[in-house]
Amino acid sequence: MLLTLPDILSPQDLQAARQLLIDAPWADGRDSAGAQARQVKNNAQLPHDCEAARAIGTMVVGGLERSALFLTAALPKKIFTPRINRYSGAANHYGNHVDSAIRTMAGSGQRVRTDVSCTVFLSEPDDYEGGELTIADTYGEQRIKLPAGHAVLYPGTSLHQVQPVTRGQRLACFFWVESLVRGNEQRRLLFDMDMALMQLRQEHGESQATVALTGAYHNLLRMWADT
């Protein structure tokens, strides 16, 4: 399931994030990549424990917690510490790859299964050329380039890449979610069911039918969830 999440960051959040990034200590993004990813990764990335990365990560997680769409789509159990990257100049692309299945959070050593990937855009589309997040799915190749503050969710199993940035700079926050429901097909079914229930309630109010369907939703979640 590929899903756009609008306005995860407010204009005030974005202004604060950009101010934090002015003097940020950028490092080679390949330093945090595995052996295979190193061969295709060419960008800059903030150390996870620097002030700018921590502050922006806190803003992003706060925005996610306020997003009903994120909560129902991702069904989050754990959120990997958000990272910040930059594509510009010679360090301007990330070739085709699939994210590692398990990531370990620095400091705590806690492991996170990467069921869902998420990118929050920090730059406006007009600020740079190229830089599309390109995701291969069952419907073909999807090219994603969203307004600043918007996010995209997609399965962690997806083959994806970031196209070369040929002008300007592309700033983004990225992270992974371990879901209560690890299977993409099951998450999609639960998401579709929840969205349909919301629409039924808006159009017809609560009824015996919506109560029964809500029960079915929770019984499926109970069957599939890993807490």
Curated annotation (Swiss-Prot):
Its cofactor is Fe(2+); L-ascorbate. Residues 78-179 form the Fe2OG dioxygenase domain. It holds the Pfam family PKHD_C. Binds 1 Fe(2+) ion per subunit. InterPro entries: Oxoglu/Fe-dep_dioxygenase_dom, PKHD_C, PKHD_hydroxylase, Pro_4_hyd_alph, Pro_4_hyd_alph_FE2OG_OXY. Fe cation binds at residues 97, 99, 160. 2-oxoglutarate binds at residue 170. One of its GO terms (biological process) is DNA damage response. The keyword Ribonucleoprotein does not apply. Its EC number is 1.14.11.-. This is PKHD-type hydroxylase Bpro_3048. It comes from Polaromonas sp. (strain JS666 / ATCC BAA-500). The lineage of its organism: Bacteria, Pseudomonadati, Pseudomonadota, Betaproteobacteria, Burkholderiales.
